[in-house]
């Protein structure tokens, strides 16, 4: 039996824009992706802290350093620019591996600048 475990999370990200005409997805700054151990085309669960809505989509790699979090296509109807969201990835693991797994958490400020990065249960790495 495999368990679905939190792999990584970008916490308190602010939606910077939306593009209803795009086919779908979420564009995320490449630096944030690297920090959170996320990659292009990876499936994500997004939670909108402003309205409680949850939706799934996939990642498009954004330009490093722009701090963009852009919702595309139908996902752009789920959160507005300025909304605070949580972006999560998950991984399947055997129970033995899952018991010792520590997801990567990246916490950002209101401008999507990384503030802290850590694995759950480890010391925070303060970034600014």
Swiss-Prot record:
Which GO CC terms are listed, alphabetically? cytosol
Matching entries from SUPFAM superfamilies are given as: ADC-like (SSF50692)
| Catalytic residues (positions) | 25, 58
Pyruvic acid (Ser) PTM sites in chain numbering: 25
User: Which free-text remark accompanies the cofactor?
Assistant: Binds 1 pyruvoyl group covalently per subunit.
Reaction catalysed by this enzyme: L-aspartate + H(+) = beta-alanine + CO2
Q: Organism's domain of life?
A: Bacteria
**UniProt cross-references to CDD domains, sorted A to Z:** Asp_decarbox
- Single biological process term from Gene Ontology: alanine biosynthetic process
Q: Name one GO molecular function term.
A: aspartate 1-decarboxylase activity
Its annotated pathway? Cofactor biosynthesis; (R)-pantothenate biosynthesis; beta-alanine from L-aspartate: step 1/1
Give the record's PTM text.
Is synthesized initially as an inactive proenzyme, which is activated by self-cleavage at a specific serine bond to produce a beta-subunit with a hydroxyl group at its C-terminus and an alpha-subunit with a pyruvoyl group at its N-terminus.
Q: Which cofactor does it need?
A: pyruvate
User: Which InterPro entries does its entry note?
Assistant: Asp_de-COase-like_dom_sf, Asp_decarbox
Q: Where in the cell is it found?
A: Cytoplasm
Q: For binding substrate, which residues are annotated in this chain's numbering?
A: 57, 73-75
- Outline the subunit composition: Heterooctamer of four alpha and four beta subunits.
As for family, the record states: Belongs to the PanD family.
Q: Mind telling me what this protein is named?
A: Aspartate 1-decarboxylase
* Native organism: Chlorobaculum tepidum (strain ATCC 49652 / DSM 12025 / NBRC 103806 / TLS)
Gene (name only) = panD
